[in-house]
Amino acid sequence: KNVILMIGDGMSLMHMYSAWTANRGKLWLDNSQYTGLSKTYCANRLITDSGAGGTALATGHKTNYHMVGVDPEGKPLESLTTLANKKGLSSGIAVTCRLWDATPADFCCHNTDRDAEAEIVADYVNCGVDYVFGGGSKLFENRADGRDLFKELREKGYQTPRSWEELAKIQKGKVFCVTDTVDTPLPAERGDLLARASMKAIDLLGQNPEGFFLMVEGSQLDDYGHFNDIDLLMQETHDFDRTIGRIFEWAAQDGETLVVVTADHETGGLTLVDGDLNEGRIVCKFSTGGHSGVMVPVYAFGPGAENFTGIFENTDIFWKIKKLLNL
């Protein structure tokens, strides 16, 4: 009935195992029932980015590096959020980055260049997604083209809270929450905002008896992989894992929800070279400040989880979810 796709941006098996070690052998992710491996290469490069990598997950098509929600020729592709809405299901996204960043845009927008930020943000007005939570308010208002996208969203029937406190009060209806709190660079300052925003999405989207599709992204794992900052990377990874835990617990009680956890690519070429499990100590090395081409893990929990075993293309995740939701 429901599918929640959780994307750890830049997350690899090594990220999760390092986090497991740092947490003295405990992760919520350990409760996954089935696991697989996903090939992340894109249409024109072995090493992908979040534009092409996320587009594969969102639409089932490999596209060119830096493209968002379009095929290699630039033709717009339908995403899982769009297909869910067409079938009468609700849809949503919750991320800890600016909404013009590639992964959220892959599910809602269409552009041949992920850096065309103002154009990408304008696409959200007509995307039809029922719940959006993320950051990046500056491109929704005070734009060079004079448009007030918050006003346009309200005219489309959205409520537009600008903080968690405002969002928490909403009990029903379509929501487009842009709060710059998600852009706080330090995970400790952001707190459990991703978990709260995700559970709020479930509360609102779950009111639809037909079901829902929700994408949740731990966005800033990627940032600290690029920065080769293992301490903040582990903080982000543990924040994402705690969000996974909240969602796994809810899904276990619900009984009709599949949760799939994966990544769009790996960032940093992370290697765990030493450590101590009892002390929660890790010694890691990075091989790059960019992305690497390794396969990324896929974890699944709930009804239909058995479909996510083995080695498969990243695009297969889309097709498996589409089939399970009968989209």
Q: Residue spans of the language-model regions?
A:
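Active-site lining segments that contact anionic ligands and/or coordinate catalytic metals
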Residues: 173, 209-213, 256, 265, ...
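Gly-rich Lys/Arg/Thr-decorated short loops/hinges at beta-loop-alpha junctions or inter-strand turns
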Residues: 57-65, 174-187, 222-227, 299-303
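Metal-dependent active-site segment of extracytoplasmic phospho-/sulfohydrolases and closely related
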Residues: 13, 238-277
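N-terminal catalytic scaffold of extracellular/periplasmic and nuclease hydrolases
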Residues: 1-143, 149-167, 266-327
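Gly/Ser/Thr-rich active-site loops/lids in small-molecule metabolic enzymes
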Residues: 232-250, 279-292
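Structural motif
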Residues: 5, 132, 177-179, 213-217, ...
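A Trp-anchored, charged/polar loop motif used as the substrate-binding/catalytic surface
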Residues: 159-163, 191-206
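Active-site His/acidic residue clusters
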Residues: 102-108, 181-184, 198-201, 207-246
